[in-house]
């Protein structure tokens, strides 16, 4: 039961920080400009530096090359979950301004702030390489395919909406966080190390990413009258996609793809994590339905109190 308690600690920390943003916003600390500033600060400054630091510190050239075969499972499972989400969005007639968020939520998870401590509690430090591998694929897909989905909801030009690499979409997709991620990968592949003072500075600023993202979710939640938070099909299906479809896609592909037993266990746990906190930030930045994104993120965190420990016990017993 100790590993379950450790997982709950991570979830309670998230709820607490979201609560701070919620309470301060209700007390008038933040206006529309403040929340936009937080979104911009995270997207343009702290998150790109966080990407560079996290990749540079957790990978080296040899480790990245050696673990390359294990990349196949997270890549295929996320693409499968994305396909299921896209079909579900059309079959169940998800609102147009929510479809990108809805589909992204199906295959993108909070793999670091919750995922890392959960896997450390369950499998120990030997799980860190697999955790970071899933994180790398998760991050790549979020800042390309995920952002593309969210951007599509904001484009009025029908021609632009039909082309992945349209000028309007590409300008938004090639964001500072994606640039930071690419820089981190290049540094690892070239076996380059930044000077310690620079890495320390990047880490200090990068550490702002998670708390600011969670405070932002609290701010967005405070703008929604509690009585108006309806559990409509868009929300319920989004939750089902996050906690059911994504992990099932991983489990369905395990017998058919080359992967170590430990990586299979870690990837399954990573797929069960709540929604990515930066999803609400991106929705705000690009003019999508940020209230829906914030509500979906917050709800998956709350439900994670029950769902994540349940999956931990199942994985520990059967996989």
Where are these regions (language model features)?
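Alpha-helical transmembrane segments of multi-pass small-molecule/ion transporters
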Residues: 1-319
